[in-house]
Swiss-Prot record:
Its EC number is 1.11.1.21. Bifunctional enzyme with both catalase and broad-spectrum peroxidase activity. Homodimer or homotetramer. Its main location: cytoplasm. The keyword Transmembrane helix does not apply. NCBIfam families: cat_per_HPI, PRK15061.1. This is Catalase-peroxidase. There is a cross-link at residues 98-234 (Tryptophyl-tyrosyl-methioninium (Trp-Tyr) (with M-260)). Belongs to the peroxidase family. Peroxidase/catalase subfamily. Heme b binds at residue 275. The gene is katG. Its cofactor is heme b. Coiled coil: none annotated. GO terms for cellular component: cytosol.
Length: 749
């Protein structure tokens, strides 16, 4: 980004810079204060298209074949300013794509290549992304040519796919549809270390519940993370903490790849397939490498890692510090990686940069030099490559792939496709002529509606039938919210479409009140059966639609306002649900329903903000939803915490009015734990209310209090109701990628 050189002179630091955004900040005074910045990301003001650009339409107008042809040409169009190894950029672009997508983690769905974040800090300056700025610069003429029809997010991944194809590999397919963002993501927790490649914090946190931080073969990584070091995508290729121990490295590999939702077979396929191509770079002293893009001077124009070792490029290039070429044909698809892995015995060696690696013992020099045809070298491997041989489970898979090349190719194609698309969400988002026909379970597939959808006349009758079941309206509201609010925008999983709330694992989550949920689902199944069997001109309705419709009908009753509804959701089956990874959507705590409490590291209100970010909520939307959900009484298990109203079940702004009432004093009510509070009358001392941290934050955090005051005003009672209905409708439709935004029914008052 170009650091200001003057800030380093005369002991000037950022706190002394008299310019916008500098000086001592609120976060310096109150580092643990609740921050709302993650709820203001990716807004229209930071988007040059003002959020009105239809990327799907633009992509569908793209000459896809011409783009791929240009990318294929680029692979062998070596540039003097960054020459291609072996005259082919294939391995380079594979690494770029892999590192763009490989930050994904299944725990919270964040990371991944879905937003083109590799262009921004910190990812653009991670040590593991060294010199990938050059890969993006090589792509720029193509991006410039095709413009808005191909996003950076799609291009960064498509380039890797084309790279594989240009070297003789048959890929599984490719789907476009990733719209670009225009600012660095602030929501992802990458760890607590403040030094590149450090890992003390993540393993200290990981071993709090057991394990030994010094036991490299068994240590536990922080549950929130998926990389073994700050600034790495997965693991240290030299081995755990730089120790060249392949068996210990296998433990780190299994942990980090597993947190990307990859099993052992997919992990072996990815490593063995990816390392069939290209090389690593460690030609000399790494101290001669300059600062990363974000730390480079302004004249570098975002070009980082400039090296003073020789020419700094080609045969003099230094990236990871490792100097490894895996096969004798690094620009061709082959089984040579696995062949060499088992054919040779390996001995510890050091790269010219001093990094730990391995070289084939007593082997001939059969590996070509990337720039000098007259030179050869012995086969080399990374510590983490040897894990595929010396870890018993990995070895079994690796030997099977060695003996069955077609099986290996298919496994790599599938694993690579999953790597690039895991955070794409439902197939309705997938665009382009290379979308594979095979449905994969990790897509969270939902059936296509093969029937006529209901209209307004049908909806009126269905609402009557819903209320005729005798189920309390609040239970319909609770189920609709639980279903829709399971969505997370990070990887587009969850949501109401599919009605997975009636399937394992969601149906058994404590937060969803399984007994009440079963009652609601049974009632709605009766309504569905009656309607669908009546053969209303071929019309049918799904349970997914009925869950939302029932919630909407109950909200109309509670608010007196019309609530828009867009039909078309369908019902997934248990066989279409990947239970083990869906379990990661289960909330530890949920402030929207006053469920759970703070952890030893995160306060309940911070968990609430994190959840609001995953729901793409703005601060006003978060505020109005909390106020409305409390008034409606939608707490977990019927709790009265935060229900600051004597009209429970009616949509009102009472939560804000009573929260801000200065006649009430709040006191801890849980023995000093600071999770539950009583609101008592200042004069009489009589208890009036109870609340949690997720409630009181709307009176304590200044920005949230300002919004609470807005909704508590006498002239904003109606505005509150309308804003709540609008925000409710947004959440109900967050996963409706099957419908254009312009076709989703909007609240009209």
């Amino acid at each position: 980004m170009g650091e200001c050189p003057f800030a380093h002179q005369a002991n000037v630091d950022r706190k002394r810079v008299p310019a916008a955004g500098f000086g001592t900040k609120n976060s310096d005074w109150w580092p643990n204060a609740v921050k709302l910045n993650v709820l203001r990301q990716h807004q229209a003001k930071s988007d040059p298209f003002n959020a009105e650009f239809d990327y799907a339409a633009a992509f569908n107008s793209l000459d896809y074949d011409a783009l791929k042809k240009d990318l294929t040409h680029l692979m062998t169009d070596s540039q003097d300013w960054w020459p291609a190894d072996y005259g082919h950029y294939g391995g380079f672009f594979i690494r770029m794509s892999w590192h763009a997508a490989g930050t994904y983690r299944v725990q919270d769905g964040r990371g991944g290549g879905g937003e083109g974040q590799q262009r921004f800090a910190p990812l653009n300056s991670w040590p593991d992304n060294g010199n990938l700025d050059k890969a993006r610069r090589l792509l720029w003429p193509i991006k410039q040519k095709y413009g808005n029809k191909i996003s950076w997010a799609d291009l960064l991944l498509l380039a890797g796919n084309v790279a594989l194809e240009s070297m003789g590999f048959k890929t599984f397919g490719f789907a476009g549809g990733r719209a670009d963002t225009w600012e660095a993501d602030q929501s992802t927790y990458w760890g607590g270390e403040t030094t590149w490649l450090a890992n003390d914090v993540r393993y200290e946190e990981g071993t709090k519940n057991g394990g030994d931080i010094n036991d490299l073969k068994n240590r536990n990584l922080d549950h929130a993370l998926a990389a073994s070091h700050m600034g790495l995508i997965y693991v240290n290729p030299e081995g755990p903490n730089g120790e060249p121990d392949p068996v210990a490295a296998a433990h780190d590999i299994r942990t980090t790849f597993g947190r990307m939702a990859m099993n052992d077979e997919e992990t072996v396929a990815l490593i063995a397939g990816g390392h069939t191509f290209g090389k690593t770079h460690g030609a000399g002293n790494p101290d001669l490498v300059g600062p990363e893009p974000n730390g480079a001077p302004i004249e570098a124009q975002g070009f980082g890692w400039t090296s003073k070792h020789g020419s700094g490029k080609a045969g003099d290039a230094i990236t990871s510090g490792l100097e490894v070429v895996w096969t004798s044909k690094p620009t061709e698809w082959s089984n040579l990686y696995l062949k060499y892995l088992f054919e040779f015995e390996w001995e510890h060696d050091k790269s010219p940069a001093g990094a730990n690696q391995f070289v084939a013992k007593n082997a001939d020099a059969i590996i070509p030099d990337p720039f000098d045809p007259s030179k050869k070298r012995r086969p080399t491997m990374l510590t983490t490559d040897l894990s595929l041989r010396y870890d018993p489970a990995y070895e079994k898979i690796s030997r099977r792939f060695l003996e069955n090349h077609d099986e290996f190719a298919d496994a790599f194609a599938r694993a690579w496709f999953q790597l690039l698309h895991r955070d794409m969400g439902p197939r309705a988002r997938w665009l382009g002529p290379e979308v594979p026909k095979e449905i994969l379970i990790w897509e969270d597939p939902v059936p296509t509606a093969d029937y006529a959808l209901v209209d307004d006349r049908d909806l009126a009758g269905l609402k009557q039938a819903i209320f005729a079941t005798g189920v309390e309206p609040s239970k319909f509201l609770a189920t609709a919210w639980a279903s829709a609010a399971s969505y997370r925008d990070s990887d587009k999983r969850g949501g109401a479409n599919g009605a997975r709330i009636r399937l394992a694992p969601m149906k058994d989550w404590e937060v969803n009140n399984p007994q009440q949920l079963a009652e609601v689902i049974k009632a709605l199944e009766g309504v569905q059966q009656q309607f669908n069997s009546s053969n209303q001109g071929g019309k049918k309705i799904s349970i997914a639609d009925l869950i939302v419709l029932a919630g909407n009908a109950a909200l109309e009753k509670a608010s007196g306002l019309p609530v828009p509804f867009t039909p078309g959701r369908t019902d997934a089956t248990q066989e279409q649900t990947e239970v083990d990874t869906f379990e990661f959507l289960k909330p530890v705590a949920d402030g929207f329903r006053n469920y759970g409490q703070s952890t030893d590291r995160v306060c309940a209100e911070q968990i609430l903000i994190d959840r609001a970010n995953l729901l793409t909520l703005t601060p006003p939307e978060l505020t109005v939803l909390i106020g409305g959900l409390r008034a409606l009484g939608l707490n977990y298990n019927g709790s009265s915490h935060g229900v600051l109203t004597h009209r429970r079940g009616q949509l009102s702004n009472d939560f804000f009015v009573n929260l801000l009432d200065m006649s009430t004093e709040w006191k801890a009510a849980d023995g000093g734990k600071g999770e539950v509070f009583d609101g008592v009358d200042r004069k009489s001392g009589q208890k009036k209310w109870s609340a949690t941290r997720a409630d009181l934050v709307f009176g304590s955090q200044a920005e949230l209090r300002a919004l609470a005051e807005n909704y508590a005003q006498a002239d904003n009672a109606d505005k509150f109701k309308k804003d709540f209905v609008t925000a409710w409708n947004k959440v109900m439709n967050l996963d409706r990628f099957d419908v254009k935004k312009s076709n989703i029914a909007r609240a009209r008052f």
